Amino acid sequence: MILPFLVLAIGTCLTNSFVPEKEKDPSYWRQQAQETLKNALKLQKLNTNVAKNIIMFLGDGMGVSTVTAARILKGQLHHNTGEETRLEMDKFPFVALSKTYNTNAQVPDSAGTATAYLCGVKANEGTVGVSAATERTRCNTTQGNEVTSILRWAKDAGKSVGIVTTTRVNHATPSAAYAHSADRDWYSDNEMPPEALSQGCKDIAYQLMHNIKDIDVIMGGGRKYMYPKNRTDVEYELDEKARGTRLDGLDLISIWKSFKPRHKHSHYVWNRTELLALDPSRVDYLLGLFEPGDMQYELNRNNLTDPSLSEMVEVALRILTKNPKGFFLLVEGGRIDHGHHEGKAKQALHEAVEMDEAIGKAGTMTSQKDTLTVVTADHSHVFTFGGYTPRGNSIFGLAPMVSDTDKKPFTAILYGNGPGYKVVDGERENVSMVDYAHNNYQAQSAVPLRHETHGGEDVAVFAKGPMAHLLHGVHEQNYIPHVMAYASCIGANLDHCAWASSASSPSPGALLLPLALFPLRTLF
């Protein structure tokens, strides 16, 4: 129930808020709806081509509330009110919901979810590339329970494959593409318990270089996990935390180079200048590690040393598209999640906007005729925005009212829990006395926690390209890679494409149509 004085205050604020002149005319809304209807009717002609290429964009922690807030921010960055803005992912014709729970967790983590949307099976919290028979931290439950990913399926089919992330390349999301680990935190052997080492388990950085030796493109952070203990970092020479971590003395970057065929062109780069100086037409393998740990937030990024996510995606695509058999590319906007965990909504939302820019870049470099693009999140966060804000209100601004309990203002953005819980003189902090628009401002939270938590609600799945219509309702998260594999005729779906081709010799554009009409359960 809204109290009368709040109704009056809100009503006055909304009456005085900005309304674009064109939106006062009913014909504007009718014309907009008719255009949307025409586009929807075109979807009756399904794209049943074979997906030569697959691009998966994963916004770590990019729940629906984050998508909406990022949409408003993107518009406001272009000096618009924001609400009417369309993200690149908003333009995708097919949208579904994904159920994100892990096999042992109602509210999931990024490791178990990555195993689901990359390997096609749900798994326990904290484990990557293994089934639910593997228990977290228990190395001896790993063997025999490994599961492979769509990156492996694509490579086995002769496609080029790549990983681009704003986290370290051995973090939860990318690691499920190539590793099998009972613990997502085993970044190098330095983070592993003696028992796990004695039982023969390998750290995730080691597995990156050894499990699938011919990953064509790897870009992100994580340099320190590749070098021997205390090796000085090339960029942060005086920072002890940036030094190498490996206890086994291995130089994994040298090992990566040694695995590449001599007649191929392989390049290791560690800064933006080196990356952009490359001629992608003369690059067969690329390893780019731009930070000792995770990459910098987009708002903090050094333009000389750190490439943007969009720049990494562009270089990756120029390399991968050279393969006539196509490619699979995993792109992670991984620091959306970190911003939320720290209660720094401005950092998180700018990360989401940058990922949307990368989605747009990929769209200009590929075609929906032969490229399936899927955008989704692994999980949500307890992030929200509300308070009856008027149209065009800064997404980082104050709500147009004060609390009817403590008589203090509050920001539109709030968290259910996290580090933003602050008490001053026994009362909730008065946010009008702080710089709530600061890049690192921690939005207020209801419950005090050092790190804000994930949310358990469903997340959106956006899809365009061949067979995108198979993402159409509410799905288990592990369904996603099965759709991508089906569209591309790889993995468990290799045979059905061969059968369709030999049975009727259809044109490439119609290759999957006969099978697209059968229930998917008959194919797996």
Curated annotation (Swiss-Prot):
- Active site annotation, chain numbering: 110
Q: Which domain of life is it from?
A: Eukaryota
Subcellular locations according to the entry: Cell membrane; Extracellular vesicle membrane; Mitochondrion membrane; Mitochondrion intermembrane space
What does the activity regulation annotation say? Phosphatase activity is specifically inhibited by 5-((5-chloro-2-methoxyphenyl)sulfonamido)nicotinamide (SBI-425).
What GO terms in the biological process aspect are recorded for it?
Answer: biomineral tissue development; bone mineralization; calcium ion homeostasis; cellular homeostasis; cementum mineralization; developmental process involved in reproduction; endochondral ossification; futile creatine cycle
Where, in this chain's numbering, is Ca(2+) bound? 235, 290-291, 306
- Gene3D superfamilies referenced in this protein's UniProt entry, alphabetically: Alkaline Phosphatase, subunit A
GO CC, alphabetical: extracellular matrix; extracellular membrane-bounded organelle; extracellular space; mitochondrial intermembrane space; mitochondrial membrane; plasma membrane; side of membrane
Which cofactors must be present for this protein to function? Mg(2+); Zn(2+); Ca(2+)
Here the disulfide bonds are 139-201, 489-497
Q: Which residues form the pro-region?
A: 502-524
What is the stated purpose of this protein? Alkaline phosphatase that metabolizes various phosphate compounds and plays a key role in skeletal mineralization and adaptive thermogenesis. Has broad substrate specificity and can hydrolyze a considerable variety of compounds: however, only a few substrates, such as diphosphate (inorganic pyrophosphate; PPi), pyridoxal 5'-phosphate (PLP) and N-phosphocreatine are natural substrates.
Domain comment from the record reads as follows: Calcium-binding is structural and does not influence the alkaline phosphatase activity. At very high concentrations, calcium can however substitute for zinc at zinc-binding sites, leading to strongly reduced enzyme activity.
- Specify the protein name: Alkaline phosphatase, tissue-nonspecific isozyme
Native species: Rattus norvegicus (Rat)
Q: Which gene underlies this protein? A: Alpl
